[in-house]
Amino acid sequence: PHAFPFLTPEQKKELSDIAHKIVAPGKGILAADESTG
C-alpha cells in the first residue's frame, strides 16, 4: 500500500531516500505511523 499514490515515481524515490535518512542510526527521529490500515 502506498501512502502517496498521487506522486510520481521520482517523488516517491525522493521520499523513500529521505525516509531512510531519517531512520538511519544516529540520524533524525524514529517515527511509527500507525494511523493507516
UniProtKB/Swiss-Prot annotation:
InterPro entries: Aldolase_TIM (IPR013785), FBA_I (IPR000741). It holds the Pfam family Glycolytic. It is an enzyme of class 4 (lyase). GO terms for molecular function: fructose-bisphosphate aldolase activity. Keywords: Allergen, Glycolysis, Lyase. In vertebrates, three forms of this ubiquitous glycolytic enzyme are found, aldolase A in muscle, aldolase B in liver and aldolase C in brain. This is Fructose-bisphosphate aldolase A. Belongs to the class I fructose-bisphosphate aldolase family.
